[in-house]
Amino acid sequence: SREIFNTVRTLEMMQENITSQNKKMLFIVAPNKNSLYDYMPSNYRKSKDKSNWERLSQKMSNVSYIDAFDLFRSKKECYYYKRDTHWNDQGAYLVVEKAMDLLGRPLLDQKEPAVFEKNAMTGDLQRMLYPDSKPNESKLVLSNPQSQMITTTRSFEQPYIETNQPNGNGSLVMFRDSFANNMITHLSEQYQYAIYDKNIPYNLSAVDKYQADHVIIEIAERNLNLIQEYKPLFLSL
């Protein structure tokens, strides 16, 4: 379709711009929960047509990306929260681990964080159905994080976050949505300086401004159309 073509071309132009500056770009589509797991209501019949992701991935030979769909389908465990639409902390860690591998920078800490905090959050589906619910989802928490927040950060839902890790390597600019909330802590441990930006359109001037070595673009499968609807600022005429 025209939308798929425009999305792919936008990503290609972003990557061309970024790699021309001797920097690396990586694209991540966060799968919809129902794209990976069963148990949808019986009145929702699964379409036999190819999904937007399937059609998109077939055209992205010139874009560096993580196939998070294959990554999660290759695992027996469920890596999404039970009462939330997002991947859980273990799932986020899997994606971060894969991203660092593809960017040629293995994780500084190879061990998955082991501190398990029960009832640390309330899932978005739970809040939708039962607004007064108490926290009922568990989270993995880094036992001894080295990174620090530069921006005043009350929540990872904030549209703009900056971090510093004195022992990290290089710098990162990440254009993201809420799926990256539980990626931020892990990524921030790897980079001396990192920026996480939820604003759309993507402002690629930040890549040069902050001398980013790596650029990660993460977006939910259900929001893929936003890439071709809101062209990155450097493409705007």
Predicted feature residues:
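Extracellular glycan-modifying ectodomains
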Residues: 1-237
